[in-house]
Amino acid sequence: MAPSSPSSAAAPTRTSTRKRAASASASAKATDEPSTKRTRRPKAETKPRKKKDEVKEEEKPPMEDDACGEEPDAEEMALGEEAEAEEAEAEQKQLDAPAPGVARKRVAQPSRVRHGSDGDHDPEFVGDPFPAKEARDKWPQRYQRNAATRRPDEEEDIKARCHYSSAKVDGTLYCLHDDVYVKAEEDKADYIGRITEFFEGTDHCHYFTCRWFFRAEDTVISSIMMENADDEKHDLKRVFLSEEKNDNVLDCIISKVKIVYIDPNMESEAKARRLADCDLYYDMSYTVAYSTFANIPLENGASGSDTASDISSDDVDSSKGKVVSDSEASSVGKATLLDLYSGCGGMSTGLCLGAALAGLNLETRWAVDFNSFACESLKYNHPRTEVRNEKADEFLALLKGWHSLCDEYVKKDIDFSSAGASENEEDDDEPLEKDEFVVEKLAGICYGGSGREDGLYFKVQWKGYGREEDTWEPIENLRDCPLKIKEFVQEGYRRKILPLPGDVDVICGGPPCQGISGFNRFRNRKEPLKDEKNKQMVTFMDIVAYLKPKYVLMENVVDILKFADGYLGRYALSRLVAMKYQARLGMMVAGCYGLPQFRMRVFLWGALPTMVLPKYPLPTHNVVVRGGAPNAFSQSIVAYDETQKPTLKNALLLGDAISDLPEVNNHQPNEVMEYGSSPKTEFQRYIRLSRKEMLDSSFEGKDGPDLGKLLDHQPLKLNKDDHERVQQIPVKKGANFRDLKGVRVGANNIVEWDPDVPRVYLSSGKPLVPDYAMSFIKGRSLKPFGRLWWDETVPTVVTRAEPHNQIILHPNQARVLTVRENARLQGFPDYYKMFGPIKEKYIQVGNAVAVPVARALGYSLGLAYQRESEGSSPLFVLPDSFTEVGRQAAPARASSVGIPVGEVVEQ
């Protein structure tokens, strides 16, 4: 594996093919300086000696002790207590608040006199009414009695006596399908709508119906994003057509407005001509449910000249109504994926497995994460992936630098097979002087990192020296050997070691937003993006803006929709929409897709206008409900409507997932072991499938190593005191520290010391029941040293395995859940091996996206990518075969439903 830090100044550094080193005095710097200085070497063939305190490039940082700390971190316990109390308070507020109905436009009281008019003009219909039969056929709901099954959040339809095709207001003639401004409440911008009806009500009042257009600030994006956005700006002339309608009295019409439809794929010159001749334009629709911005179906947009575009009919797939380029048509069935903030690869693994079931060969070509152990895990399980261990912002800078290098060194007609064969910078047989060194080849590229200054660096292999002597050198020091740079860039371009704009079909990732965590006492509620801990959301979107993938899938915690009125969630949507991506936001619960944990997460789809926007897969399993969603986004929970009665599989419980795993002790040093028994449940049979059976092509259709072995079945080793405590926790459902001697439960379910029982002590002299357990959540908590049970689920798999303030003890063993048991709760296949210290493995598993959720989303992506996803509904039903063990669901197709309310490169 490549080094995580540059070589020290004490080690000789070579910077070109035949370049003289600087004087000895120039190298007399501290050993922590980046390796941009040169030292004099006595003889070219002499191997340099390392100082004793010097870290070799290939050495890894020392393994952290894989044991639980002697005492829990006091500040961490306090922060956990604050976060839990805040979460409970927020959930209570949610329960107390009324659930919002469908957003409806309202208008102010109509004004009889208009400024600038010649006098009072009573609004009036023009011409004869529609024939009665035609009116009833066009608008049947206006002539029917109100249905008894009307939903509580639906407005009652105003009944009509007759309908008209035109009306006159303030002397201006308005016709059906005209676009108009409609009077809004005081201090609000006038509403924008398209007239769909003129009718006289049974109350003899004159009405019109509008189908509303939304400005960006009227949508979930909100005016806050419009005012504070420092990135892509929203075009103020751009509006979004919705399906929402309202009835209003005729006098609320203010004036006409010219709105044209712009095909998202229209050529720029044609678009400019149309925009010059309009007041506003629209290219997408907006739906409140799932905060959806989407292409407008041809039958649902504008008509006549309004829909005209300058796209050749030869480019349109008439059966689908979508633009298909030659490159897209040839690439159907295969797609490339970039996994940002990849962790150990749970999200990309699930996406690829699901896409394969839909018939799409989705391959994770690139992955980026700052955790070196997570990168090692991902690389092992996806050996063909170019895995980069670096910060995302440095990765973006590298992409831009790589693009420039490709422009400089790669020609379209290049013959890669003979690249560099005919060029020689100099005669390698010429004898070296004592301070000269030869660049044998360039082996890697990075941008900054590890204390280095910003800029491009190459990993240099020196002629006559082993790989342990490789160094990272700035590009400025290698300008004397352009052939080596050219060879590296041309080969890297051919192998696509880094993506260029247009190379990536799908970007997925979960940018960390630690600034909104309850474990952060200094959260910026007014301007969350000013907090450095939330800046990765910006970086993620910047990478999307640069690479322009066909699809984007961002995952994050539900707090991005709760904290600061959902600022970060709104920001992510705003960026995608401003970049002209279709977008859709939903919240999915891991337990709904066959896991024994709740774990609600936000998933945001983005799709170029040329592509089909993916839907959300509806649940396949019942789930034990825990917590809820923010009210403002309650229409974004992926679930069946309460009026629907689907047939779902039973909720998965802890025993379904882990009851087949062998018993292990508090300390289990073996990373590989035998199962010892056969699977007992459908889930266990599925999770034990091989790579080949799961359609995992990471090993090119082979099963890979360790086939049939049980991996990572290791618990975090409890310290002696905690192990003694755990051994005394009863083996029963609901057991925890409250069952230990000396504790009793008093009023209001608050624990207290039992005055009749002397305090019990451990062999170390410390108390059996620690004070922190008694005081946690003011004595109300059931979590310290809590034992899970077979018929329960967990709220969410976490990154820590300490039992001090969470329920994580095995049902009938004196230990915490193992890494593999946690991995099963996240849906990782048993063949998926983790690397690093045990504590790091827990972190990797806990931070991952639940694999079954990603798999279901991957299936949706596969259908959309191949244009096999039909209808405008945001939801679809997975085929029955999707959840059946050993069944390949590729031939099956889902059905839509209606809307409910390379090398690990380290730096």
Swiss-Prot record:
Which Pfam families does the UniProt entry name for this protein? BAH, Chromo, DNA_methylase
Provide one Gene Ontology cellular component.
nucleus
Chain ranges of the SAM-dependent MTase C5-type domain: 335-868
Composition bias (Basic and acidic residues) maps to: 30-63, 115-124, 131-140
Q: Name the enzyme's class.
A: transferase
Alphabetical list of InterPro entries matching this protein: BAH_dom, BAH_sf, C5-Methyltransferase, C5_DNA_meth_AS, C5_MeTfrase, Chromo-like_dom_sf, Chromo/chromo_shadow_dom, Chromo_domain
Null allele phenotype: Reduced overall plant height, early flowering and reduced fertility.
Q: Which residue numbers delimit the BAH domain? A: 172-297
Q: What induces it?
A: Down-regulated by salt and dehydration stresses.
* Single Gene Ontology MF annotation: DNA (cytosine-5-)-methyltransferase activity
Q: Which PROSITE patterns match?
A: BAH, C5_MTASE_1, CHROMO_2, SAM_MT_C5
Gene3D superfamilies for this protein: 2.30.30.490, DNA Methylase, subunit A, domain 2, Vaccinia Virus protein VP39
- State the UniProt keywords alphabetically: DNA-binding, Methyltransferase, Nucleus, S-adenosyl-L-methionine, Transferase
* Keyword Repeat set for record: no
Which spans of this chain does the record mark as coiled coil? none
Q: Name where it's found.
A: Nucleus
Major location category of this protein: nucleus
Ranges for domain Chromo: 437-500
Q: Tell me which EC number(s) this protein carries.
A: 2.1.1.37
Protein task? Involved in CpXpG DNA methylation. Plays a critical role in the maintenance of CpXpG DNA methylation and suppression of a wide spectrum of transposable element (TE) activities. Required for proper plant development in reproductive stage.
Q: Which family does it belong to?
A: Belongs to the class I-like SAM-binding methyltransferase superfamily. C5-methyltransferase family.
Q: Report the PANTHER family cross-referenced here.
A: CYTOSINE-SPECIFIC METHYLTRANSFERASE, DNA (CYTOSINE-5)-METHYLTRANSFERASE CMT3
Name of the protein described by the UniProt record: DNA (cytosine-5)-methyltransferase CMT3
Which species is this UniProt entry from?
A: Oryza sativa subsp. japonica (Rice)
Q: What is the lineage of its organism?
A: Eukaryota, Viridiplantae, Streptophyta, Embryophyta, Tracheophyta
